[in-house]
Regions:
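N-terminal, intrinsically disordered, low-complexity segments
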Residues: 1-47, 219-222
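Cytosolic juxtamembrane helix and N-cap/initiation of the first transmembrane helix
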Residues: 24-76
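Alpha-helical membrane-associated segments of multi-pass integral membrane proteins
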Residues: 56-77, 145-208
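Transmembrane alpha-helix entry/boundary detector in multi-pass membrane proteins
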Residues: 60-64, 83-109, 128-141, 161-171
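Canonical alpha-helical transmembrane segments
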Residues: 104-125
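Long, compositionally biased low-complexity segments enriched in polar/charged residues
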Residues: 108-113, 147, 213-218
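Cytoplasmic juxtamembrane regions at transmembrane-helix boundaries
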Residues: 120-145, 202-205, 209-210
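Low-complexity, proline/glycine- and charge-rich juxtamembrane/linker segments of membrane proteins
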Residues: 200-222
Length: 222
């Protein structure tokens, strides 16, 4: 009788398999926790309120840099390309792109390269980082190609080559910064949402400075 009662009590107190499975599914994985710690360590938010402010600030900066890149391309390439002699520039060695199409390819390649490099670093994926590095070098080659043609082939004068490469540098830099801000904002939003839904905290503990008063000081020697 005692053994039967003990077995019934153990069966009643034992958790149901479905409840255990649900608890395991709801628990954050070590991969997600490590990724959140990597993001927090890189961006260094002090608390959850600062995470919210950083999301808003980076989203705003991403939009501002993105529209600045578009306006610069519109004025310097789309509208002013003919006056700067873009139609006389030779086609690119890679893809046989004209300068107008090159001004669209460079920001596209830069955008994808920035996303791959950022996600490869945060996730610790070598293939993603490898692909991002390949695209980054390709974008750099397309940007400096006019200067290289001037120095090696001699089919461009100095002013034309510097003007062509300079515009591509500005476009690539603006789109890189805009994409980086956008990805950081999305990652911070993911960290904030995961912390709120999973009730975990990956933020570093704040250490208040220790203020020593005069009472703690040793008396002077007489």
């Amino acid at each position: 009788m005692v053994l039967g009662e003990d077995s019934h009590e153990e069966a009643a107190s034992a958790p149901a398999p479905a409840a255990v499975a649900a608890e395991i599914d709801d628990a954050p994985s070590a991969y997600n926790v490590e990724m959140m710690e990597s993001i927090v360590q890189r961006l260094r938010p002090e608390d959850r309120h600062q995470i919210r402010d950083m999301i808003s600030e980076r989203g705003r900066m991403s939009g501002a840099l993105g529209i600045a890149c578009f306006l610069f391309w519109w004025v310097a390439v789309h509208m002013g390309g003919d006056s700067l002699g873009d139609s006389d520039l030779p086609a690119s060695l890679i893809g046989d792109f004209s300068y107008y199409h090159l001004s669209l390819v460079v920001p596209g390649v830069t955008l994808v390269a920035t996303i791959l490099l950022t996600m490869g670093r945060e996730k610790g994926q070598s293939l993603t980082s490898n692909a991002g590095g390949v695209l980054a070098v390709m974008a750099l080659f397309l940007v400096v190609e006019p200067i290289g043609r001037m120095a090696l082939l001699g089919d461009l004068d100095t002013q034309t080559a510097l003007t062509a490469s300079g515009r591509l540098v500005i476009i690539a830099a603006l789109i890189h910064l805009a994409t980086k801000m956008m990805v950081d904002s999305i990652l911070l939003e993911w960290v904030r949402g995961f912390m709120m839904s999973s009730d975990i905290d990956v933020l570093p503990e704040r250490q208040d400075p220790i203020i020593e008063g005069h009472a703690d000081e040793a008396p002077p020697l007489v």
